[in-house]
Structures are given as structure tokens and as C-alpha cells.
Swiss-Prot record:
It is an enzyme of class 1 (oxidoreductase). GO terms for molecular function: chlorophyll binding; electron transporter, transferring electrons within the cyclic electron transport pathway of photosynthesis activity; iron ion binding; oxygen evolving activity. NCBIfam families: psbD (TIGR01152). This is Photosystem II D2 protein. It catalyses: 2 a plastoquinone + 4 hnu + 2 H2O = 2 a plastoquinol + O2. 2 of the reaction center chlorophylls (ChlD1 and ChlD2) are entirely coordinated by water. It is a multi-pass membrane protein. The chain crosses the membrane at residues 41-61, 125-141, 153-166, 208-228, 279-295. The modification N-acetylthreonine is found at T2. GO terms for cellular component: chloroplast thylakoid membrane; photosystem II. The gene is psbD. Fe cation binds at H215, H269. The D1/D2 heterodimer binds P680, chlorophylls that are the primary electron donor of PSII, and subsequent electron acceptors. It shares a non-heme iron and each subunit binds pheophytin, quinone, additional chlorophylls, carotenoids and lipids. There is also a Cl(-1) ion associated with D1 and D2, which is required for oxygen evolution. The PSII complex binds additional chlorophylls, carotenoids and specific lipids. Pheophytin a binds at Q130, N143.
Length: 353
């Protein structure tokens, strides 16, 4: 019996082949299959955000002005979260809440779920775009893997956290000052800065900034012109065709500075990838924990001693008092629908007061 080996060839192109040829064609802006997800979602997310910050009020959901039309500026305008009474409703335009009424849909906070969901899928589409292009030009997919960090943070903060709470109301609104308010909320209600996952996130982001600055400066310092040795000052020519730098010189320099240095470029650049991505993933995990109201460090012994001894106070106990103040002063303003009233005598005061 004879077995013929070979590639199967089609006589004519089907619809998939035709679409594949058009989507993956070499053009100024690559589209690709990922573009079918990325471009519509990014368009709707950005369009919804610009529409909301320009025209839509938050009076019906938060009792706030939040649009340029009402007098806000770029820092104070926002697309606000839906009302707390709407819980985790997707707030579809044709759903039972808005019933196809676009004005009412905007008043209820429908633009927030619209922007959040399209934004999440737009980010996923951008990561798939990096996968697709990397595969097309036969690169490793580390760019896409790195971009999973920002996606994890976005999904955990804007989607998973409010899903663990009573509704979308407790997610961040899409605006600069609104994000600042959310950060204060996280600190007051979750003591977020003392959370080890937040600490790892800060170490990752600031460590990555330090590594980036050191790496950029070192490469600039050790650039040399081909054929003229590694004299970094005399030989540097910004018009040379190809930028090159001396790893040997850089290694010698940092060995003298710190006593240790990266010995090869692969380990160096992997470390620069690992630090920020791991930090972002750890902070995302921490936010998932907060969604479930998990607590981090509680130094109860210090709190008890501070309550018993007016002269004993630590930075931790001071921060706990500050958090109580945030909760007491913020809750009434942040959740007006609850009609919270705190008498003066229950508002926290430090030992010095």
C-alpha cells in the first residue's frame, strides 16, 4: 500500500480565506482578526466616555454634577457608576430599567456599564492584537503577556470588586477626581495601603520605573559607533545607522557601583518584564480579596493598648483613626441614598484632640 504525504490544497478560496486575506493584509494600520474585537469595543468605550463626560449628569445616581455641560472641567468630569439600587444589572438600553429610553438610560448610569464592558473587551482585543502580530512576524508573545498586567488591574478594580460588593455603585467612576475619591474610599474602608498585595504592586510599579530609568541611562551612556571601540563620549554619533551599546562596559560600571550586575541581556530584560507585571498581578489579586472583604494586617494589640493608654500611639493606630474618620465623614456624602447621620460625639478623634 502506498501512502502519499503532502499538504492539502483547496481549489478555490472560501469565505474564511477571503476574510483572512483582507484582515491580515499589510497596511498602514493592521486590522487582523483581533481588530474585529478591538476597534468596535475601543470606539464605543471612548465614545461613551466622551459622551458621558460632556453631557450626562450624575444627579440621579450620586447627587453630583459630573459633565462639562454642568460646569465640570477635565479633572472633575466623570462617567459615574449606576445607582446603588440597581445592584449588578447590566443596564442594557433595551432592559427593564431604561426600556429603550436613551435619556433615562443615561440618567440611570447605563453609560458606565457600557464603557466598563466595552473597555474590558477592548483591552482584551488589544492583547490579542499583540498575540496575532507576534505570531505573524514570528516573535515571542511576551508583549501580550506583559499587557495582561494592566488588564488584570482593570478587570479586578472595575468589574470584580463591585461584583463582590452590593452593586456597580461601589466601582470607580470614569474620571480623574472620581478615581481619587475611590482611592480614599479604598483606604478608609479596606485599609488598602497596609495590604501586602498593595505593597507588592507599589514595589513592582516603582521598581519598574527605577529599572527603566537605570536601563535607559546605561544604554545611552554606553552607546558607541561601530568600529571605533567603546569610548562612550568621543565615539557617540547620533546619526549612525544602527544603535549599538557595550554590554561589557555597562557590566563593568554597575559591578563597580553595586558589586553586582546583570551578566547578559536576556536576564536583564526578563527582569524588567517580570517586576512590573508581577506587581500589577499581585495588586489585582489584592483587589479581588477586597471584593470579598478580606482583611490584611490588623494589629489589634496596638489598638487595645492605644485605647487603654492615652499616651501610647503608633503610626498604625493613627492611621486606624484616620480610616474611621474617612468612613464617618465619607459615607454620608458618598451614599446619600442611605440618609446616614453621624452625631458629633461618634466622629473619631485622635489622642491629641
Amino acid at each position: 500500500m502506498t501512502i502519499a504525504l503532502g499538504r492539502f490544497t483547496k481549489d478555490e478560496k472560501d469565505l474564511f480565506d477571503t476574510m483572512d486575506d483582507w484582515l491580515r493584509r499589510d497596511r498602514f494600520v493592521f486590522v487582523g482578526w483581533s481588530g474585529l474585537l478591538l476597534f468596535p469595543c475601543a470606539y464605543f468605550a471612548l465614545g461613551g466616555w466622551f459622551t458621558g463626560t460632556t453631557f450626562v449628569t450624575s444627579w440621579y445616581t450620586h447627587g453630583l454634577a459630573s459633565s462639562y455641560l454642568e460646569g465640570c472641567n477635565f479633572l472633575t468630569a466623570a462617567v459615574s457608576t449606576p445607582a446603588n439600587s440597581l445592584a449588578h444589572s447590566l443596564l442594557l438600553l433595551w432592559g427593564p430599567e431604561a426600556q429603550g429610553d436613551f435619556t433615562r438610560w443615561c440618567q440611570l448610569g447605563g453609560l458606565w456599564t457600557f464603557v466598563a464592558l466595552h473597555g474590558a473587551f477592548g483591552l482584551i482585543g488589544f492583547m490579542l492584537r499583540q498575540f496575532e502580530l507576534a505570531r505573524s512576524v514570528q516573535l515571542r508573545p511576551y508583549n501580550a503577556i506583559a499587557f495582561s498586567g494592566p488588564i488584570a488591574v482593570f478587570v479586578s478594580v472595575f468589574l470584580i470588586y463591585p461584583l463582590g460588593q452590593s452593586g456597580w455603585f461601589f466601582a470607580p467612576s470614569f474620571g480623574v477626581a472620581a478615581i481619587f475619591r475611590f482611592i480614599l474610599f479604598f483606604q478608609g474602608f479596606h485599609n488598602w495601603t497596609l495590604n501586602p498585595f498593595h505593597m507588592m504592586g507599589v514595589a513592582g510599579v516603582l521598581g519598574a520605573a527605577l529599572l527603566c530609568a537605570i536601563h535607559g541611562a546605561t544604554v545611552e551612556n554606553t552607546l558607541f559607533e561601530d568600529g571605533d571601540g567603546a569610548n562612550t563620549f568621543r565615539a557617540f554619533n547620533p546619526t549612525q545607522a544602527e544603535e549599538t551599546y557595550s554590554m561589557v562596559t555597562a557590566n563593568r560600571f554597575w559591578s563597580q557601583i553595586f558589586g553586582v550586575a546583570f551578566s547578559n541581556k536576556r536576564w536583564l530584560h526578563f527582569f524588567m518584564l517580570f517586576v512590573p507585571v508581577t506587581g500589577l498581578w499581585m495588586s489585582a489579586l489584592g483587589v479581588v480579596g477586597l471584593a470579598l472583604n478580606l482583611r490584611a494586617y490588623d494589629f489589634v494589640s496596638q489598638e487595645i493598648r492605644a485605647a487603654e493608654d492615652p499616651e501610647f500611639e503608633t503610626f498604625y493606630t493613627k492611621n486606624i483613626l484616620l480610616n474611621e474618620g474617612i468612613r464617618a465623614w465619607m459615607a454620608a456624602q458618598d451614599q446619600p441614598h442611605e440618609n446616614l447621620i453621624f452625631p458629633e460625639e461618634v466622629l473619631p478623634r485622635g489622642n491629641a484632640l
